[in-house]
């Protein structure tokens, strides 16, 4: 039973890490393909995932609002 709970915890941890990498990969892709960070839908998705941005187009994820 203990092994099962450890396995479930590891699966959740890995899925969270993959989701975080996906957000960062999306940011890099936006920077490379468009050269700008003014895509409103893109920033809205980031805000929904707990990311914030400032006027200098820098970003910090995981710090809340």
UniProtKB/Swiss-Prot annotation:
Tagged with keyword Lipid biosynthesis: no
Signal peptide: 1-19
Species per Swiss-Prot/TrEMBL record: Californiconus californicus (California cone)
Subcellular location: Secreted
Comment text on domains: The cysteine framework is XVI (C-C-CC).
Disulfide bond entries: 51-60, 53-61
Name recorded for this polypeptide: Conotoxin Cal16.1
Tissues showing expression: Expressed by the venom duct.
Pyrrolidone carboxylic acid found at: 49
Alphabetic keyword roster: Amidation, Disulfide bond, Ion channel impairing toxin, Neurotoxin, Pyrrolidone carboxylic acid, Secreted, Signal, Toxin
């Amino acid at each position: 039973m203990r092994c099962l709970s450890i396995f479930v915890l590891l699966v959740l941890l890995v899925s969270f890490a993959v989701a975080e990498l996906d957000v960062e990969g999306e940011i890099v892709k936006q920077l490379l393909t468009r050269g700008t960070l003014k895509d409103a839908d893109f920033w809205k998705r980031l805000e929904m995932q707990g990311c914030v941005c400032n006027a200098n187009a820098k970003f910090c994820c995981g710090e809340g609002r």
